[in-house]
Amino acid sequence: MISDINALKYKKVLLKVSGEALMGDKQFGHEYDVIKKIAGDIKEVINLGVEVAIVVGGGNIYRGINASLVGMDRASADYIGMLATMINALTLQNVMESLNIYTRVLSAIPMMSVCEPYIRRKAKRHMEKKRVVIFAGGTGNPFCTTDSAAVLRAIEMNCDILLKATQVDGVYDSDPKKNPDAKKYFTISYKDVITNSLQVMDTAAIAVARENKLPIRVFSIKEQGNFARVIQDKGEYTTIEE
């Protein structure tokens, strides 16, 4: 374990955790053993001296875009999806605090009874005090994904890198679950991700990351300890940069 924070390349990071990552092998909801493992991985990174922020998705509970396809108003469906991210954020906070990780949930949609509203300066101050900040509610606007929220929050918090935790160990030229010959990229440019329509993040999120020179690293959250390894340039991952 690195004791000198100055030895680390990335000292402030944002972790994007999908809702699907929280449900493990279930079809819906939460798998608490999986969430506890993720919380343990986060604690390992905190112990390195790294400042950590998190954006959590809501796809394990509700997907606004899917609901809109069957007739629900898209904006209303997206707001319901934002509420799903709040459920996940509070669940993750509870598990993390059981491991003695100081955590604050800040929501883009004010819910004063359960968490703080998102205020950029307050969020940065929490991170300076070594608290983990979980951003809920996406961007607070419909028609925006939680990937876009992750990129925006990473930029606002002046993070060195965005880590996207997924079910696969990087970015491939096709779905490795369907194509055994899929090629994995070690590094790939923002432009190539967009041009090749690679399904790692939505185009808007990649475009904003590119404009602000925010590197993105995609890795698998399924293997314990991967988060700490990846921010130290170890393990399996793909880096998206210029």
Swiss-Prot record:
Catalyzes the reversible phosphorylation of UMP to UDP. Signal peptide: none annotated. It comes from Rickettsia massiliae (strain Mtu5). It comes from the Bacteria. This is Uridylate kinase. Its main location: cytoplasm. Homohexamer. One of its GO terms (molecular function) is ATP binding. It is an enzyme of class 2 (transferase). GO terms for cellular component: cytosol. One of its GO terms (biological process) is 'de novo' CTP biosynthetic process. Pathway: Pyrimidine metabolism; CTP biosynthesis via de novo pathway; UDP from UMP (UMPK route): step 1/1. Its EC number is 2.7.4.22.
